[in-house]
Amino acid sequence: MKQYLDLVKHVLENGNQKGDRTGTGTKSVFGYQMRFDLSEGFPMVTTKKLHLKSIIYELLWFLKGDTNIKYLKENGVKIWDEWADSNGDLGPVYGHQWRNWNSEEIDQISELITELKTNPNSRRMIVSAWNPSVLPDTKKSFEENVANNKAALPPCHAFFQFYVASPDLEKGETKGKLSCQLYQRSADIFLGVPFNIASYALLTMMIAQVCDLEPGEFIHTFGDAHIYNNHFEQLELQLSREPKPLPKMILNPEIKNIFDFDYDDFTLVDYDPHPAIQGSVAV
């Protein structure tokens, strides 16, 4: 996937060597953007194999408004284990903010769907996970923050906005096209970004379907985009591999409510990636 490999090259060639919260050290850039036309295939990195099951179940978990890893673990997903407390709780992280902002029954996802259906020209179709009132105290442990009703981690993918392009009648288009732009304040390029691309591309496709729209673009905008010092070798290996054609994601066309999707409603076709590459998570 050229856009992703171009990002990797850009950071390796132009990045600033910096320290970081985890003590691992990074090479990073500030401000970068990638664009993916979803009509050209599903943007799933092919220069290493991704664990699609984790991507889908995590997104469904967000949409449920869940913040306990029990659902993830029951479905074989371990990507949040390092940050949960002894009960599996993570505090008011993504799902809580998306569906129950400040515990005041502000359901941003439901409000977004309503706005897309009734006022698609709106410039206010934004979902925010960045809530300063629940950001963790950096001097305290994950467990202490959760006990104090704070998030175990601040959101990396902070907020996203949707845009509906009117159909081009001269081209025979009958439906508007839905595009999504994500602002990601902090991006782990080797481990996190491939997941984030696939997750938000999939979310865009799901919302387009339930709003009777066609998927347009996924636009990925970064703040601090970084490569951890212990991931250089893995990314050089990816750069040495020839990208393969993008797969196609098929959604169950019977689903008309964003909250009715289940794991079996997604079928990825023609995904033929290079072998997986292991890398340590910076905690």
Curated annotation (Swiss-Prot):
Pathway: Pyrimidine metabolism; dTTP biosynthesis. Keywords: Cytoplasm, Methyltransferase, Nucleotide biosynthesis, Transferase. One of its GO terms (biological process) is methylation. It is found in: Cytoplasm. Its EC number is 2.1.1.45. It catalyses: dUMP + (6R)-5,10-methylene-5,6,7,8-tetrahydrofolate = 7,8-dihydrofolate + dTMP. One of its GO terms (cellular component) is cytosol. The keyword Transport does not apply. It holds the Pfam family Thymidylat_synt. InterPro entries: Thymidate_synth/dCMP_Mease, Thymidate_synth/dCMP_Mease_dom, Thymidate_synth/dCMP_Mease_sf, Thymidylate_synthase. Coiled coil: none annotated. DUMP binds at residues 21, 123-124, 185-188, 196, 226-228. Catalyzes the reductive methylation of 2'-deoxyuridine-5'-monophosphate (dUMP) to 2'-deoxythymidine-5'-monophosphate (dTMP) while utilizing 5,10-methylenetetrahydrofolate (mTHF) as the methyl donor and reductant in the reaction, yielding dihydrofolate (DHF) as a by-product. This enzymatic reaction provides an intracellular de novo source of dTMP, an essential precursor for DNA biosynthesis. HAMAP family: Thymidy_synth_bact. Homodimer. Belongs to the thymidylate synthase family. Bacterial-type ThyA subfamily. This is Thymidylate synthase.
